[in-house]
Design a protein with these regions (language model features):
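Hydrophobic protein-protein interaction segments
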Residues: 1-139
Length: 140
């Protein structure tokens, strides 16, 4: 997406989350947050101020939106997942690079939901501690 479209989509998502109509539970590999803070891997060359501002924004959202927004950080050296989104009991989507695979069959959705639950159980940083962890990375 272009920047204006991405910003608009993010604003819409924040407004939806703030409305209290839905909860968001997100599992992210911890190395993504650490790489962003350190300016390595995908984030190499991105200005430190920009990276820190983004991480601070994420930490603020975690504080303000908890428990409607729960982010868990897992160790991708121990557990692996392609990006997956569960939209309730009837739809799950897996991102495979250039496209998404959508599943509507109940047993497949249950299987992907169980996989996501496993990521949450294996998290090395619980949702209650994510904002503190993020801030510790940008205060080094």
């Amino acid at each position: 997406r272009r920047l204006p479209q991405a910003f608009s989509a993010m604003q819409d998502q924040l407004q939806w989350l703030s409305s209290g109509v839905s909860d968001y539970e997100i599992a992210v590999p911890i190395h993504e947050i650490e790489s962003c803070a350190a300016g390595t891997a995908y984030y190499k060359g991105v200005d430190e101020g920009v990276r820190y501002e983004q991480l601070d924004f994420i930490a603020d959202q975690c504080d303000q939106m908890f428990p409607r927004l729960r982010i868990f950080l897992f160790d991708a050296h121990r557990v692996f997942s392609s990006p997956v989104t569960i939209f309730g009991p009837n739809l799950a989507v897996v991102y495979v690079g250039q496209c998404y695979l959508a599943f509507r069959e109940v047993e497949r959705v249950k299987s992907l939901s169980s996989h996501f639950d496993w990521l949450v159980r294996e998290a090395v940083v619980d949702a209650r501690n994510v904002s503190t962890h993020i801030r510790s990375l940008i205060e080094r």
